[in-house]
Amino acid sequence: MIEYIIGKISYKNNNYLILENNFKGYKLFMSDPNIFEENSSAKIFVYTKIFQNNKNNFLFEYYGFKTLREKIFFENLLTVNGIGPKTSLTILRNDLNLLKELIRNEDIESLSVLEGFTNKTALSIVSALSYKLKNERISEYNNDVNHSSINQQSNSYNPVPDLVSALKALGYKKNMIEKAINLLIPQLSNVSEDQISDLISQAIKIISDEAVTNKTTVS
């Protein structure tokens, strides 16, 4: 099996990219191909799916990941009943450290508003992976080149549960909360509890701006 490919990115769109290596072009489905630039060189970790078509021919489908940690988490997701490769890629559009922390903490409510999740999906993933991820916390230090950032992330305050609870209490719907949190994810690392009010205000503004935009479009 291919573990990773080093090559040149010849094409990309929102769903996949084509990586050239040794005069071959590999179509790699990814959660976010746009993190790479066309015509640049890259090392991409690969998961290979092998299946048969209706003519009993064996076909190969490739999924790409920027880091080994992403690939390992993707493979963990595939062990969950009802979770396939496409759903797993959608889930990986969320911050990986945040996902792992919420799963370890069995925080169904916070997971269910993230991209790729429903309440049923969140429950299935937590039931299947929470114990495993708790036991694998130490091994992550061997799979990531930036040990200090993981340590800092795991010890920091996680504002997502408080943010979700506050927005739900204010009457906002799941899809609104999901969009706001996904837009705020870059700001959610290394925040303190006294900043939660500011985050709630920012989330409300995002939701309000979205509502105005949709109303203008309809008009």
Swiss-Prot record:
Region feature (Domain I): 1-66
Region spans: Flexible linker: 149-154
Positions of the UniProt region annotated as Domain II: 67-148
UniProt subcellular location: Cytoplasm
Main localization, broad class: cytoplasm
UniProt keyword list: Cytoplasm, DNA damage, DNA recombination, DNA repair, DNA-binding
Transmembrane segments: none
Record GO terms (molecular function): ATP binding; four-way junction DNA binding; four-way junction helicase activity
Keyword Translocase: no
Domain of life where this protein originates: Bacteria
GO BP: DNA recombination; DNA repair
SUPFAM superfamilies according to UniProt: RuvA domain 2-like (SSF47781)
Region called Domain III, residue ranges: 155-219
GO CC list: cytoplasm; Holliday junction helicase complex; Holliday junction resolvase complex
Keyword Transferase: no
Subunit structure: Homotetramer. Forms an RuvA(8)-RuvB(12)-Holliday junction (HJ) complex. HJ DNA is sandwiched between 2 RuvA tetramers; dsDNA enters through RuvA and exits via RuvB. An RuvB hexamer assembles on each DNA strand where it exits the tetramer. Each RuvB hexamer is contacted by two RuvA subunits (via domain III) on 2 adjacent RuvB subunits; this complex drives branch migration. In the full resolvosome a probable DNA-RuvA(4)-RuvB(12)-RuvC(2) complex forms which resolves the HJ.
UniProt xrefs under NCBIfam families: ruvA
Function: The RuvA-RuvB-RuvC complex processes Holliday junction (HJ) DNA during genetic recombination and DNA repair, while the RuvA-RuvB complex plays an important role in the rescue of blocked DNA replication forks via replication fork reversal (RFR). RuvA specifically binds to HJ cruciform DNA, conferring on it an open structure. The RuvB hexamer acts as an ATP-dependent pump, pulling dsDNA into and through the RuvAB complex. HJ branch migration allows RuvC to scan DNA until it finds its consensus sequence, where it cleaves and resolves the cruciform DNA.
Record remark on domains: Has three domains with a flexible linker between the domains II and III and assumes an 'L' shape. Domain III is highly mobile and contacts RuvB.
Family: Belongs to the RuvA family.
Protein name per the record: Holliday junction branch migration complex subunit RuvA
Gene label: ruvA
